[in-house]
């Protein structure tokens, strides 16, 4: 069956963007391909599957900058970007399954505020169990990983994953805040943000 799936990567980091991806394709083919939640795959597996997904499906994504994330409620921003991606589809499809970061009913209402295209919206917790959502999670993760590598190349700093649970990320923030500042989410509820002005 051909329909759409949406998922994101990078909601939780303190460094780097969030990426939201939409994949429209054949669920049966994706199942046979071995598509599953990106968190359950190695980097090499994600890259390999990414190439197959892009070749055989319609793929759209948006890279959401830290500065934009700082300006909005994260769920509202994610819903708006998701709706924009769906609105950009020219193909007629039956429905789109979307991984929900909150109660599915609430998230659906957020999306519908911005949706212009006539399509059935299905929001789910643990949406990655759906092959199209899983494919979107792979696309989002691969694109975000590439964006993180670009930041490392531009700054010359290996800050690890960008997540606050990563010791390398914490250390990099303490040592190189001035350089990393354009890529940092200022409103992240993380104790080091209280001390960021110490490094200005």
Curated annotation (Swiss-Prot):
Matches recorded under InterPro entries: RNase_H2_suA (IPR004649), RNase_HII/HIII (IPR001352), RNase_HII/HIII_dom (IPR024567), RNase_HII_arc (IPR020787), RNase_HII_hlx-loop-hlx_cap_dom (IPR023160), RNaseH-like_sf (IPR012337), RNaseH_sf (IPR036397)
RNA-binding listed as a keyword: no
Annotated function: Endonuclease that specifically degrades the RNA of RNA-DNA hybrids.
Amino-acid positions noted as binding a divalent metal cation in the UniProt annotation, renumbered to this chain: 7-8, 99
HAMAP family for this protein: RNase_HII_A
A Pfam family the protein falls into: RNase_HII
Annotated keywords: Cytoplasm, Endonuclease, Hydrolase, Manganese, Metal-binding, Nuclease
Family, as annotated: Belongs to the RNase HII family.
Protein name: Ribonuclease HII
Primary location group: cytoplasm
Biological classification of the source: Archaea, Nanobdellota, Candidatus Nanoarchaeia, Nanoarchaeales, Nanoarchaeaceae
Keyword Manganese: yes
Cofactor note: Manganese or magnesium. Binds 1 divalent metal ion per monomer in the absence of substrate. May bind a second metal ion after substrate binding.
Gene3D superfamilies tied to this protein: Ribonuclease H-like superfamily/Ribonuclease H, Ribonuclease hii. Domain 2
Cofactor: Mn(2+); Mg(2+)
Gene Ontology cellular-component terms listed: cytoplasm; ribonuclease H2 complex
Sample GO molecular function, one term: RNA-DNA hybrid ribonuclease activity
Subcellular location: Cytoplasm
Segments forming domain RNase H type-2: 1-200
CDD domains found in the cross-reference section: RNase_HII_archaea_like
NCBIfam families in the cross-refs: ribonuclease HII
Gene Ontology biological-process entries: DNA replication, removal of RNA primer; mismatch repair
